[in-house]
Amino acid sequence: SEILAVTFTNKAAKEMLARLQNMIPINPRAMWVGTFHGLCNRLLRLHHQEAGLPATFAILDMSDQLGVIKRVMKANGIDTEEFKPREVQNFINRCKEEGKRASEVYSKFSKDKAYIQIYAMYEAVLQREGACDFAELLLRAYELLSRNEMIRHHYQERFRFILVDEFQDT
């Protein structure tokens, strides 16, 4: 199918799929309908090698992500009282949502510099362990499509109709 439909929640994705099925006589499996994270996961699973991921990469939820951050900080002797793991987590996710890897983040503030170092160590752990957090799914998919012309062209040709539900809310 030539339809890509994306939304923010699983519930909204199911509703969107049901609406599309009622409107269009197409096998629903042929359409790509889901959340941003779900569709990015699908894309990365199909093109895991090009995205630099193992075929069976794990997805970390927020709790798992925080656990990895704490492990990184402990292994590197970083004081979790001075640098709160949840603040580090928010910093990392904000950077990824802005499309920035640790190597692309700059700051003149010492606290941010420490966060950037933790972010870099965290990235290395995820890469070594073959894992992605939620923000990483979006960033890797963006990087894959922006850097790989052949894959980007394939999806530009495949999807003639792109529906974004609740786009005005972004």
Predicted regions and their residues:
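Conserved helicase NTPase motor core
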Residues: 4-5, 12-13, 32, 61-64, ...
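Alpha-helix N-cap and coil->helix boundary residues
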Residues: 31, 83-87, 154
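Coupling/switch/interface segments within P-loop NTPase motor domains and analogous charged loops
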Residues: 62-126, 130
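P-loop NTPase Walker
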Residues: 1-55, 59, 129, 146, ...
